[in-house]
Amino acid sequence: MEKWWLNSMLRNRELAYKCGLSKSTDRFGPIENTSVSEDPPILTDMDKNIHSWNDIENCSYNNVDYLVGVENIRNFLSNKSFLVRDSKRNSYSIYFAIENQILEIDNDHLFLSELESFFSRYTNSIYLNNSSKGDGDHYMYDTESSWNNNINSFIENYIRSQICIDNYILGDGDKYNDSYFYSYICSTIRKKSSERERTSIITSTNNLNDSDFTKIEGSNDLDETQKYKHLWIECENCYGLNYKKILKSKMNICEHCGYHLKMSSSDRIELSIDPGTWNPMDEDMISVDPIEFHSEEEPYKDRIDSYQKTTGLTEAVQTGTGHLNGIPVAIGIMDFEFMGGSMGSVVGEKITRLVEYATNQLLPLIVVCASGGARMQEGSLSLMQMAKISSALYDYQLNKKLFYVSILTSPTTGGVTASFGMLGDIIIAEPNAYIAFAGKRVIEQTLNKAVPEGSQAAEYLFHKGLFDSIVPRNPLKGILSELFQLHAFFPLIQNEKESRS
């Protein structure tokens, strides 16, 4: 994976390199080495240092490798988080989206003061040098306006002057025509998934000799990773870092390798159900420790309370009704974050009631499975939920001839796999989902035999005929809608929607 460093954006004298993207989209443009003086001309002679579109391909570069592949330019421009160093070498996190005009900075008043001071000087200089260009110049801003109102404009214009980008890459040629995007990107930190190594490359701008880039390896990168750990989610497959605030919009799919990360039940409801149509069922049903399970570490009730506070859920499943592309459905979604999605008496009862409600209302049924199996703290009461749910599904499927779709996510194991997880009329699995009855560790310890790698992955099991299809999250809602319509479940017309509401 690659993590970008925007190094010392606040130091005027370090504005030494210009990065250009040529009009040809198959290569990253050259980097020009400009001179740097004690009084940097970038603030007073900006126009002299900016090349026109016709001059882009004439730039030359020395001792500088490509900074980023062309295929990553779109992502770089739209949404990126930068680790920014100020003049005192302190690091801060900045999330910046030009197109959406979003700017988020670590809340540190000293850093913000320095940033404000720099951009105030920068904007004043640009305003004075371009005051004769007319009202249409995009460098002209009211320098007396408040910091809060103009910070996005300051940074956007600062970034516009160093990288020349083809208009179509931005998707808005009119807005960004004849403008330049500044980038003072010092380097990338490349992380190898196998070795878990991190290397940072930082531009050396104080001394412009033959070695324009200094490579630094060590524990500093690990410290930075820990410092900003709350901003990122690490992919369990490639170990790439995904920014938390945009991961949800990507359906919790790793932007580096496409791996499907775990997803909360609430996010799945938002993904599958039409907005404003979700009606939860049995939200107040909670476990009361039916067998008074004894634990030397933490009492069962206390553990339940802890997970309720952490997840905001009452149990490991959410059940209810809603519309999927206008089609009324009954849906149950298990949440692995709540005690590993384990199936206790409450989980079994909620799913059974959901099946019975769908039977009475003649609704199609969806159950999204994500579970480690039966909950050991409830003993045989948790095991009997397998038979109870299966019995309700028998009436739903065979007697009422209704349609049940089972969706297996990672992980789906134990009693859930052995019961309702495998009883769907259509069984769908997510890519790379871990699906098994007994886990790999349990099998190896019990049978003293090694479990072949990948033998419990969705792709291998699909080829063995264990389920019907592997469907990524992106097209899942549309595919479910088509399946329901093939089985004579159609979207409600407006009058029916109003009468049901």
Curated annotation (Swiss-Prot):
Zinc finger (C4-type): 235-257
Subcellular location(s) of the protein: Plastid, Chloroplast stroma
GO BP: fatty acid biosynthetic process; malonyl-CoA biosynthetic process
A UniProt-annotated Pfam family: Carboxyl_trans
Signal peptide: none
Catalysed reaction equations from the record: N(6)-carboxybiotinyl-L-lysyl-[protein] + acetyl-CoA = N(6)-biotinyl-L-lysyl-[protein] + malonyl-CoA
Gene Ontology molecular function, alphabetical: acetyl-CoA carboxylase activity; ATP binding; carboxyl- or carbamoyltransferase activity; zinc ion binding
One Gene Ontology cellular component: chloroplast stroma
Domain CoA carboxyltransferase N-terminal: 231-501
Function: Component of the acetyl coenzyme A carboxylase (ACC) complex. Biotin carboxylase (BC) catalyzes the carboxylation of biotin on its carrier protein (BCCP) and then the CO(2) group is transferred by the transcarboxylase to acetyl-CoA to form malonyl-CoA.
HAMAP family in the cross-refs: AcetylCoA_CT_beta (MF_01395)
Name of the protein: Acetyl-coenzyme A carboxylase carboxyl transferase subunit beta, chloroplastic
